[in-house]
Swiss-Prot record:
Its cofactor is heme. This is Cytochrome P450 97B2, chloroplastic. It is found in: Plastid, Chloroplast membrane. Heme binds at residue 519. The gene is CYP97B2.
């Protein structure tokens, strides 16, 4: 559940149908053909030849950068300026271009989008400065502007004062007893999906009696929605097996959130847009359906509140509660004082941030495993040894080390989100980072900053063989003696942590952000992904239907596919 989610910005419109959203129209996204990670670097650079003279670049792109430089008062200190042409952004995800410019200009550079400039950061030293050391000098900037109409004062778009108050209330809800109860929900929902697959295997009309072909991205999307519904609201969407007006409204809202995060001009802020533009009218209708549902759930939770003693509430047995949801905890702990509107904003944030992240993580984990059969067999061997045919439990997750490493390695190669967005609230001096200016870079208040998680996770300066799928890499200490200001990777730096994090990597690995505004639901999302992947591999062998190159990548709030992740599933031979 990535509560600190953010997204790419785009100037390109591209209407596509995506089965993951149940045949809804998905515009304003980039798509790009993808292959195995080790081949990505050669593909992503094909539209940029850094040996070309700058004068040979697209004239419009150069003019755009010149205008940006003039309007922003020249370069920010001696910060390099990316002179990418507009054509560099066509037909490929933005973060691929950001990577190319990172290799060309360094870990901190200024990027022009018309008359607007952004600072792009691809260095853990600088990311640590922004996210942890100087966290309260930055807010979510343009991301908050985009998402406020949808999430209100939820954790993502909230101003700092509101965020501090809501964080104090919500963070205690993600305690170990709650997570242990959630693992039961994860397994129950995953079992529904496994049962659905088994029933399809028993049917007819597929390519053989022992296999079925499915869009696993769509299936993971439905699974993640059901888990969020039960774990956060105590509401069963049942989207694995059915549709309803609420489910359609949820997907419509998710779609609109993604649309707004990938469209550069916020036309929806025009007062008449909600009445004139058909998609905005539909969004208002979808939002009304969801808000009515959430208001009813909040009302029921308040009316059914029985225990008022805070100490007893904190000590109750979550495993045996009929309703162990986050909503139940927040209402019980705050009682009549809880504000319905703020609570609804919090729940909406959890719904949108939590759903997309998990579905994307599972999709890319399967994509990577399908290209590495030996690693899939190793994962299945671990599952067989630890669980046999049993269900995952909170305790058994601690023994499923390789599955956990697969999940985090998938997040390293395909971070969700690929960008974190911040805006400086006051002037600041960014560190120069690796190979940057020793005195750093002064930036004025109001500067929009892109922290490229994708660049951080694939940086050749901080990772060995950064494009390779190597789950075991997080077990190996990487003592850094060459890069001043970066402590290297050390698994012992975060004792007791089930999953690698920004602490062990000193901010070179940021799957859920870092610092005070780090995602509050990171363990929820990681455990959810681990359980779902475990149960899939426990029951099935998975192959890609086509070639890796046939999988087209689309970016919005997260990294997903253009036409689904079509795979061939076979019942494992030991279970037939």
């Amino acid at each position: 559940m990535s509560v600190d989610t953010s997204s790419t910005l785009s100037t390109v419109t591209d209407a596509n149908l995506h089965s993951r959203f149940h045949s809804r129209l998905v515009p304003f996204t980039h798509h790009f053909s993808l292959s195995q990670p080790k081949r990505i670097s050669s593909i992503r650079c094909q539209s940029i030849n850094t040996d070309k003279k700058k004068s040979s670049r697209n004239l419009l792109g150069n003019a755009s950068n010149l205008l940006t430089d003039l309007l922003s008062g020249g370069s920010i200190g001696s910060m390099p300026i990316a002179e990418g042409a507009v054509s560099d952004l066509l037909g490929r995800p933005l973060f691929f271009s950001l990577y190319d410019w990172f290799l060309e200009h360094g870990a901190v550079y200024k990027l022009a989008f018309g008359p607007k400039a952004f600072v792009v950061v691809s260095d853990p030293i600088v990311a640590r400065h922004i996210l942890r050391e100087n966290a309260f000098s930055y807010d979510k900037g343009v991301l908050a502007d985009i998402l406020e109409p949808i999430m209100g004062k939820g954790l993502i778009p909230a101003d700092l004062d509101t965020w501090k108050q809501r964080r104090r209330v919500i963070a205690p809800a993600f305690h170990n007893s709650y997570l242990e109860a959630m693992v039961k929900i994860f397994t129950t929902c995953s079992e529904r999906t496994i049962l659905k697959f088994n029933k399809l295997l028993e049917g007819e009309g597929y390519d053989g009696p022992d296999s079925i072909e499915l869009d696993l991205e769509a299936e993971f999307s439905s699974l993640a929605l059901d888990i969020i519904g039960l774990g956060v609201f105590n509401y069963d969407f049942g989207s694995v097996t059915k549709e309803s007006p609420v489910i359609k409204a949820v997907y419509g809202t998710l779609f609109e959130a993604e649309h707004r995060s990938t469209f550069y001009i916020p036309y929806w802020k025009i007062p008449l847009a909600r009445w004139i533009v058909p998609r905005q009218r539909k969004f208002q209708d979808d939002l009304k359906v969801i808000n009515t549902c959430l208001d009813g759930l909040i009302r029921n939770a308040k009316e059914s509140r029985q225990e008022t003693d805070v100490e007893k509430l904190q000590q109750r047995d979550y495993l045996n509660l009929k309703d162990a949801s986050l909503l139940r905890f927040l209402v019980d702990m705050r009682g009549a004082d809880v504000d319905d509107r703020q609570l609804r904003d919090d729940l909406m944030t959890m719904l949108i941030a939590g759903h997309e992240t998990t579905a994307a993580v599972l999709t890319w984990a399967v994509f990577l495993l399908a290209q590495n059969p030996s690693k899939m067999k190793k994962a299945q061997a671990e599952v067989d040894l630890v669980l046999g045919t049993g269900r995952p439990t909170f305790e058994s997750l601690k023994e499923l080390q390789y599955i956990r490493l697969i999940v985090v390695e998938a997040l390293r190669l395909y971070p969700q989100p690929p960008l974190l967005i911040r805006r400086s609230l006051k002037s600041d001096v960014l560190p120069g980072g690796h190979k940057g200016e020793k005195d750093g870079y002064a930036i004025p208040a109001g500067t929009d900053v892109f922290i490229s998680v994708y660049n951080l996770h694939r940086s050749p300066y901080f990772w060995d063989r950064p494009d390779d799928f190597e789950p075991e890499r997080f077990l190996v200490q990487n003592k850094n003696e060459e890069i001043e200001g970066w402590a290297g990777l050390d698994p012992s730096r975060s004792p007791g942590a089930l999953y690698p994090n920004e602490v062990i990597s000193d901010f070179a690995f940021l799957p859920f952000g870092g610092g005070p505004r780090k995602c509050v639901g990171d363990q929820f999302a990681l455990m959810e992904s681990t359980v779902a992947l475990t149960m899939l591999l426990q029951n099935f062998d998975v192959e890609l239907k086509g070639t890796p190159e046939s999988v087209e990548l689309v970016t919005g709030a997260t990294i997903h596919t253009k036409n689904g992740m079509w795979c061939r599933l076979k019942k494992r031979s030991n279970l037939r």
